[in-house]
A protein has these predicted regions:
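Ubiquitin system architectures
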Residues: 1-110
Length: 110
C-alpha cells in the first residue's frame, strides 16, 4: 500500500479520531492481507498514521477489522470470509475510490 502512483484505489481509513488516506494497490486481495498491509504501514510510520500494537499491556492479542456504514446507515464489519468460507476482498464489498472505512480494534482475552 503506497500513496504514490495511480494503481489501485485510494481509501480513507479512520482509527482513534485520526483519518488517513491510503492507496490500496490491489482491492482484490483478501481483507486479511489488506489489514496486514495497513499494520505494516503503521509500523513504518506510527506518528504519521497510527500505533497498531499486536498485544495490549496485559499480553492479550489484539485483532483488527475493517468496518463501514452500509447503505442504510448501519455499522457493517467487512468479514474476512463469506458463508462458503471463501476469502473476501474490498472489491467483493464494492469498496471504491474515496470510500471511508473504519479500523476496528478487538482485544482477544487470553
Amino acid at each position: 500500500m503506497e500513496n504514490q502512483g495511480k494503481k489501485g484505489i485510494k481509501v480513507l481509513f479512520s482509527f482513534e479520531n485520526r483519518k488517513v488516506a491510503m492507496r490500496v494497490e490491489n482491492p482484490k486481495q483478501s481483507i486479511k492481507q489488506t489489514i496486514e498491509n495497513i499494520k505494516k504501514e503503521a509500523r513504518n510510520d506510527p506518528e504519521k498514521i497510527w500505533y497498531l500494537p499486536e498485544m495490549d499491556a496485559g499480553d492479550n492479542i489484539i485483532r483488527y477489522y475493517l468496518g463501514r456504514k452500509d447503505e442504510k446507515g448501519k455499522d457493517e464489519i467487512l468479514k474476512e470470509k463469506n458463508k462458503e468460507g471463501l476469502e473476501q476482498s474490498l472489491y467483493d464489498y464494492g469498496v471504491k475510490e474515496g470510500d471511508h472505512l473504519v479500523i476496528i480494534k478487538k482485544v482477544i482475552a487470553g
